[in-house]
């Protein structure tokens, strides 16, 4: 009886401790080329905000519970000086190595909000285009991962091809309400259908059918760039 009473007394504190723990994100580059990983919540960096990852390297960051609207992405073809200032052909975030804001399209985005009423919400988005294949999966149990690893760049419609590489979203290219959904009312287009056909688990436009995955609060995650390269290597 005493043990049961003690458990019920401690349970709220144990639950609070679990939900107040920072989530661990392991960011892995399995591409054959160097990428510059970035992590931001739009108005501030997440952890250090960015880091160069050569092929096969990884970077682990801690993200505070309650974080909303966090994003992780890869930048390509970057140059930075010793002060951490420079430029990237895709995903550039104001010329900084350590991103404080989101990157410039095209970018494949791993998006998340943590510990929202005890749940985490994760997704991959092509709403800002596509530059690097990606897998976004939990490393703890309780939910599935999502992936967008198709050859979108190779099959990109001519009008969406980005000069610096990658495949732009239609809103970035055409800047119309049809593609940007500025009125709050829009449907799929030929371009969003292109992204959806190749990556059905990823958001293809603002009002896309729900593709968010719900995970237990305080889960840990892994974001892998070029995940199929890892699978081929392991065969």
From Swiss-Prot:
The protein's UniProt keywords, in alphabetical order, are: Cytoplasmic vesicle, Disulfide bond, Signal, Taste-modifying protein
| Keyword Disulfide bond on entry | yes
Which Gene Ontology CC terms are recorded?
cytoplasmic vesicle
Signal sequence extent: 1-22
Which cysteines share a disulfide bond?
31-226, 78-88, 93-99, 143-215, 148-199, 156-167, 171-180, 181-186
As for subcellular location, the record says: Cytoplasmic vesicle
Enumerate the propeptide ranges.
230-235
Q: Which PROSITE patterns match?
A: THAUMATIN_1 (PS00316), THAUMATIN_2 (PS51367)
Q: Which domain of life is it from?
A: Eukaryota
Q: Which Gene3D superfamilies match?
A: Thaumatin (2.60.110.10)
SMART domains under this entry?
THN
InterPro entries from the entry? Answer: Osmotin/thaumatin-like_sf, Thaumatin, Thaumatin_CS
Q: Which family does it belong to?
A: Belongs to the thaumatin family.
Q: What does this protein do?
A: Taste-modifying protein; intensely sweet-tasting. It is 100000 times sweeter than sucrose on a molar basis.
Q: What is this protein called?
A: Thaumatin II
- The organism of origin for this protein: Thaumatococcus daniellii (Katemfe)
Q: What is the lineage of its organism?
A: Eukaryota, Viridiplantae, Streptophyta, Embryophyta, Tracheophyta
